[in-house]
Amino acid sequence: MQVKDQLSSLQPYKPGKSPEQMKEVYGDHSFVKLASNENPFGCSPRVLDELQKSWLDHALYPDGGATTLRQTIANKLHVKMEQVLCGSGLDEVIQMISRAVLKAGDNIVTAEATFPQYRHHAIIEGCEVKEVALNNGVYDLDEISSVVDNNTKIVWICNPNNPTGTYVNDRKLTQFIEGISENTLIVIDEAYYEYVTAKDFPETLPLLEKHKNILVLRTFSKAYGLASFRIGYAIGQEELIEKLNVVRLPFNVSSLAQKAATIAFGDDEFIEEIVRVNTEGLRQYESFCKENEIPFYQSQTNFIFLPVENGGEIYEACAHAGFIIRPFPNGVRITVGTREQNEGVISVLQQHFENKKRKSRDEANA
């Protein structure tokens, strides 16, 4: 049986190991998952209360257009309902965009170290992928602009960026957008938008009024704590959203997910508290890194990235202590947890780096 040739160069997405899978390797004790940037505090209590009270007819298909949820999003963000597209997580939204826009001979431009699904779906559609190195962990928009050409159909900007947690500020993003042809779609992935505290972070929704080639992506999987429900959304001009709806699967978001997201979107107090606690958690890690001269990227998300050598060793040390983090070739990414969880990981990091220093001293004196 024949499939697309380009599939031979790709692998299925491999998520981080679950606590159950970790037990098979590291022993039968409890594990704290801090690898996938989920909300360690769960979702709004209102969601749990309402879902217990409500009744859904599970024999019926969901509202294919997610009308109530889209209207709720539109009302809060001051856009039209027709400007909102919902998907089964941002993964599906990214797939929809790629399928609708890309064809063989096109190219996309993005960063080297960023969310891998941009690249994945471009290759599936037979496109060239142009990746630009980060500049100190941040998207280099000047360099990205220099490699955009007439065949560039999408520029993907993850802001704040995953896995580094860094961001492009308002001035740089606005300047970049002004220099890109409206024939090129600029997708700004703001999955971690709710966690941002930087004063100069871009407010992208007003840009939609002036630029027809911008899409903004957000999700309920992170700050809202609804990752298992799989729901994300895009906001853009009506004409573009209408075309993306053509490739959207019928009934793509379950009734349960729509209801949970609608309730969660109205609980501003919950999000404010989550952001407050998350900011405190980031300060825990930042203080530790500064005191011990360990490099880190200033994060605007619910995780912190340490650009260090031997990320695999740090992963192993954390795993043996009951913490699941995400290793990378050039460092580790750690989801911010509860205060106690953060203290536990920091204790492991402290021991790891002390052992490393001791080993270096011993080798120097040998």
From Swiss-Prot:
Q: Where is the composition biased (Polar residues)?
A: 1-11
**Names of required cofactors:** pyridoxal 5'-phosphate
Which InterPro entries is this protein grouped with? Aminotrans_II_pyridoxalP_BS, Aminotransferase_I/II_large, HisP_aminotrans, HistidinolP_aminotransfase, PyrdxlP-dep_Trfase, PyrdxlP-dep_Trfase_major, PyrdxlP-dep_Trfase_small
Q: Which GO terms describe its molecular function?
A: histidinol-phosphate transaminase activity; pyridoxal phosphate binding
Q: What Pfam families does the database record attribute to this sequence?
A: Aminotran_1_2
User: What catalytic reaction does the record list?
Assistant: L-histidinol phosphate + 2-oxoglutarate = 3-(imidazol-4-yl)-2-oxopropyl phosphate + L-glutamate
Q: Which UniProt keywords apply?
A: Amino-acid biosynthesis, Aminotransferase, Histidine biosynthesis, Pyridoxal phosphate, Transferase
The question of whether Amino-acid biosynthesis is a record keyword is answered with yes
The protein's enzyme class: transferase
State any GO BP term from the record.
L-histidine biosynthetic process
- Family membership noted in the UniProt record: Belongs to the class-II pyridoxal-phosphate-dependent aminotransferase family. Histidinol-phosphate aminotransferase subfamily.
Q: Which PANTHER family match?
A: HISTIDINOL-PHOSPHATE AMINOTRANSFERASE (PTHR43643:SF3), HISTIDINOL-PHOSPHATE AMINOTRANSFERASE 2 (PTHR43643)
Q: How does it assemble?
A: Homodimer.
This chain's protein is named Histidinol-phosphate aminotransferase 2
Q: Which organism is this entry from?
A: Bacillus thuringiensis subsp. konkukian (strain 97-27)
